[in-house]
Each structure stands twice: as structure tokens, then as C-alpha cells.
């Protein structure tokens, strides 16, 4: 008789413990039910990127001194810098600068180590194309400023916290 009572007490304690665990899990689930949905309707809604977002690289041709620091610090030696030495003024003159965004890993080393700050990251992240050769940007394509997501009136912007 005593054995049967202790088994019943152990069984009831296990039932109470299981009900408590189920209740805790249910409370966590219900606390998430009050949150707003995270999904956005992409072409019509866009997320405002953070201040430190690493998007497409912007290049300012006039500031570049063709020092090739960006090529040396790039982990994949990606930027292609063509220059010519001007003998009369003994300085390098930049002829061409290009980056292939199909290969770029957007690490930001080129921007961080550039001595003249001619490179900067933009908030542009829409780089998809049907032909991968279109992702090879020369100095003219790198020089154009992207359309700001905030300034585009056709798109509803969403701030994610």
C-alpha cells in the first residue's frame, strides 16, 4: 500500500512538472504573438539600411592618387588600377579603375585603408543582373551616386530596430 502511494505521488509530481514546462513554452509562444511581422513586400517596401551598411562602393576619380593601397589590402586582389607616370610632374595619373562586384566580398578594407578617402560604401544593395559581366564596374559606373531609398517617393521605407 505504501509503495502504491509513493508511486502515485511521484506520478503526480511528474504531471505537474510537465504541465509547468508546457505552460512556460506556451507563454514564450504567446509573447511572440504580439510582435509585428518581419516580412516586407520587397519591390514596394524597402528596409532603411543602417549607417554602417556595406553596399556598393562609390569611387571619386578626382581624389584618387593611384597608390594601389586598395589592391594590396583586398583579400582577393580585386580592384584593377591602371595608371601612367607623368614624368614632367613626377606623379601618377589614374587611367582606369574597376571593381567586379560579382567577385567582391564587401569586406570594406579598401575603404578603410584608402589614404585620400576616394572610396566609400553606399546604401545600394540591388546589384542583381542576368549577365555577370555587367557587374564589372569601371570608374564611370563607380562614380555615379545611387538613388537614395529614403528619397524615392514610390517606395515605402521601413525602419527595422
Curated annotation (Swiss-Prot):
- Record lineage: Eukaryota, Viridiplantae, Streptophyta, Embryophyta, Tracheophyta
Tell me the organism. Phaseolus vulgaris
Which Gene3D superfamilies does the record cross-reference, listed alphabetically?
3.30.70.3270
Q: Where in the cell is it found?
A: Plastid, Chloroplast thylakoid membrane
Which top EC class applies here?
Answer: translocase
Q: Domain of life here?
A: Eukaryota
Recorded hits in InterPro entries, A to Z, give: 4Fe4S_Fe-S-bd (IPR017896), 4Fe4S_Fe_S_CS (IPR017900), NADH_quinone_OxRdtase_chainI (IPR010226), NDHI (IPR004497)
Task: State the protein's purpose.
Answer: NDH shuttles electrons from NAD(P)H:plastoquinone, via FMN and iron-sulfur (Fe-S) centers, to quinones in the photosynthetic chain and possibly in a chloroplast respiratory chain. The immediate electron acceptor for the enzyme in this species is believed to be plastoquinone. Couples the redox reaction to proton translocation, and thus conserves the redox energy in a proton gradient.
The entry's [4Fe-4S] cluster 1-binding residues are 64, 67, 70, 114
Enzyme Commission number(s) = 7.1.1.-
User: What name has this protein been given in UniProt?
Assistant: NAD(P)H-quinone oxidoreductase subunit I, chloroplastic
Amino acid at each position: 500500500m505504501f509503495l502504491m502511494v509513493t508511486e502515485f505521488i511521484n506520478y503526480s509530481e511528474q504531471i505537474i512538472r510537465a504541465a509547468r514546462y508546457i505552460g512556460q513554452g506556451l507563454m514564450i509562444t504567446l509573447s511572440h504573438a504580439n510582435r509585428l511581422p518581419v516580412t516586407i513586400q520587397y519591390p514596394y517596401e524597402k528596409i532603411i539600411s543602417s549607417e554602417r551598411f556595406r553596399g556598393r562602393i562609390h569611387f571619386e576619380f578626382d581624389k584618387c592618387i593611384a597608390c594601389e593601397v586598395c589592391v594590396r589590402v583586398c583579400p582577393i586582389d580585386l580592384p584593377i588600377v591602371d595608371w601612367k607616370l607623368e614624368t614632367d610632374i613626377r606623379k601618377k595619373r589614374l587611367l582606369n579603375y574597376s571593381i567586379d562586384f560579382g567577385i567582391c566580398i564587401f569586406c570594406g578594407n579598401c575603404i578603410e585603408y584608402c589614404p585620400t578617402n576616394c572610396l566609400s560604401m553606399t546604401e545600394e544593395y540591388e546589384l542583381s543582373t542576368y549577365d555577370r559581366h555587367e557587374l564589372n564596374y569601371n570608374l564611370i559606373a563607380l562614380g555615379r551616386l545611387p538613388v537614395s531609398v529614403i528619397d524615392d517617393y514610390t517606395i515605402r521605407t521601413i525602419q527595422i530596430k
